[in-house]
């Protein structure tokens, strides 16, 4: 029996959610919208690579992450890069993902300090990773080259988020 790409992705996403639920409390990483958009919305090798990197980690992100991820998928649907059905499934997976969301309010000063280097959205992820002293995982290679940050930024090779 052959499974459709959508079925394989649904199984992979469910596996990631289950695996993260079981291992919640292990290694903590901050994840940005680009890597989550790929992990939950991409059925190909980029998505698989992102899911493998996130598996077994405790995921943390600023609470704006949900809006940013949904915005990525909205653009992909509008550009016909993703079906609305697939995006709706990915939104459901995002809602079920054991992701600790953190308010960005306490990081506003650091976000402002980073204004010349990155957008305020990206700065929120950086500030959170700095505060937790953990790695920030992204699918945005440009972000991984940002200067003046005080955390490790790991870009997932081959992933093209955003």
For the regions a language model picked out, list residue spans one by one.
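Short, well-structured N-terminal submotif of metal-dependent ribonuclease cores
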Residues: 2-64, 76-85, 159-162
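Active-site neighborhoods of divalent-metal-dependent phosphate/nucleic-acid chemistry enzymes
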Residues: 3-8, 12-19, 97-142
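Active-site-proximal, substrate-binding regions of enzyme catalytic domains
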Residues: 70-98, 102, 110-111
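Short acidic-hydrophobic, aromatic-tinged amphipathic segments that line or gate anion-handling sites
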Residues: 101-104, 153-158
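Short loop/helix-cap segments at secondary-structure boundaries that form the rim of catalytic
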Residues: 144-150
